Amino acid sequence: MKRIIIASFILFLALTSANARGVKVRSVKGLRRAIERAVPGDTIVLGKGTYRLKESLRIEGKTDLAIIGDGAIISGGVRIGRWRLRKASGMAEGARRLNLKRYPLSGVVTKGDPHLTGPSWSEFFADGRSMRLSEWPDGGPLPLDSVVVRGQGRIRNQPGDGFGTIAFSSDRPLEWKDPTLGWLSGCFRFGWTNEMVPIAEMGPGKTFTAGDLTNYGFGFQPGDRFQRWRVLNIPEEVTLPGEYSLDASSKTAVLMLPEGCKRLEMSVMEDPLIVLDGCEKVTLQGFELCYSRGDGIVITAGRDVQVKDCDIHGLGHVAAKIDSANLRCGLSGCHLYDLGAGGVELAGGDRRNVVRGDNYVEGCRIHNYNRIENQYRVGVVMSGLGNRITACEFYDSASMAILMLGNDQTVEYCNVHHVCMDIEDNGALYYGRSFAHRGGVIRWNYFHDIEVPFNVRAVYHDDGSGAAEVYGNVFQRISSPPVQIGGGSYIRYHDNTFIDLPCAAIKVDGRLKTWGADRVPIMRDSIRHVDSPAFWEHYPELEPYLNGDPAEPQHNTLINNVFCNVAAAFEKVVWSDHFYNNDIEGRANFFDEMHGNSKVEKLDGGLALPERVPPTSQHELHFIHDAFNGAQYGILDERHTAANGNSQ
């Protein structure tokens, strides 16, 4: 017998009463009580309102349960009355000071270590939009052209002295009352590593000394276009609407609210908002999750757990984590945006024993997910074996859309654009540096409008990684070669279409034989994590490949691809064993010839992409609008529909 628990009437009446403020403790207790009492077959429906948490909402060991938000908001923050803001003397016109002694407060912390990440500091949100730390200079980062002390590097243990010192020429920092409130932020050596380290002191000779190690030290490559820096969190630099500065020691903040701001929130909670542990056939639907320093949803040891139609935003870390112990768990139809350090961490499956996870992210819109960290903090990072990303849209990101690690992963029907907008040597879809990462399938995606002055790809097989099949994709308007095979083997590209490129479409190199030879031991070592009879049997080509010369690219296939209006089809094809039937054309009927049963229509003098790319009995990829004119598109198959819409 199924029961429906209407939480707003039974347990949460305070949220619908005339004087309710959405902060009643008994409301959250009631929600927890409803979950505890639920039996298989129940549905819990929450009334509209804001449920403010001080600790994680835990759903443990439940079976066959639906929890429906119906617009309910789960918040890890506090609302701050504007009457608490006072004029900030000595600061810019419009700046206000806020005393935060009554609130739990976390100060700004070091960010940028690719191996360590965690909750953000306490952030402010004005009318639902994140505010940003004050920045100097306002006109953008400064070139790193004067390094006094290089400092040691955290990752490669670069030789150097201490934490590093850089010089500046402006007199403006001399006006700051306390420079040690500031944080140095920027790319201090390589363009793929953006960091934040505290200022330990400002020296008399116009210098800043860092208070922590950076990843690679300062200024090893003077003149590199990515070596740039700025200072964040100085109170005197709160000069533009939407900026703030935070002083955890005095528990105060200086803010300049956007014009017309009606609601101010501050993130407080550090733990995940919702944890689903050991659940089976549980659905969480229709919630808005926001204003937390940590993660939104964490799913552990679940079976058939689904997060559906949720808006997750304003978090200091990631929207959702699905760990390796889950099976058939995922997100569907969710909108993930304004996130601190990535969208979804999608794990699952057993690589050593070759057991699929079948976890997924499908039909989701994921954007603006690098507010705080961007180095390998991506829209979705995949790990494990046998998981998929289907029918998702990724855009407006400083970093990658997808980091594909592990085995037998699938990325399909996705719309990927305007990503990698502020990073170097990356790819919209990226994987690298492991001979064990194999079996990836990248099919029927649309990569487009990645036009930046940096060295980024649409699909990047980095540092010898390979064993992937890439087909049916469309690549359009990308400023660097959309595809790079960086020394890998067993990569098969077929039936892809490349359009409107000012560069070569595909680049293949043999870096493991030359400048990247030092990667080979690292790549070989990656096998030990999955060394088992089951793994070797599943990938029979791997053993002879490793017993030969794995540094030599081999068994790469580039066939049946189409190129139209590109500078060149291939930058280098020396390391391709099979290379034929690649059609390089600029004529209007090239789609007809490439895809025999595809219907091509003229739209406003341009070309519509074919209805099927390539034709298949199981799936259909429908491009609804004229991709030549840069329009949006939709994608359909028998199970999935992509959700399109404007950025929020």
Task: Give names to the regions the model predicted.
Residues R52-K54, G61, L331, T410, ...:
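Acidic, glycine-rich calcium-binding repeat modules characteristic of RTX/beta-roll
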Residues I6-A18:
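Hydrophobic h-region of N-terminal signal peptides that target proteins for export
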Residues D295-V298, G316-L327, Y337-R612, A642-N644:
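Glycine- and acidic/polar-rich repeat regions and solenoidal domains
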Residues R37-P40, H313, Y337:
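Charged, alpha-helical scaffolding/interaction elements associated with membrane systems
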Residues M1-I4:
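Positively charged n-region of N-terminal signal peptides that target proteins for export
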Residues K24-R26, R32-R33, R37-T300, Q306, ...:
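Extracellular polysaccharide-degrading/modifying enzymes targeting complex plant/algal/animal polysaccharides
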Residues V305-D311, A468:
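Surface-exposed extracellular loop regions of Gram-negative outer-membrane beta-barrel proteins
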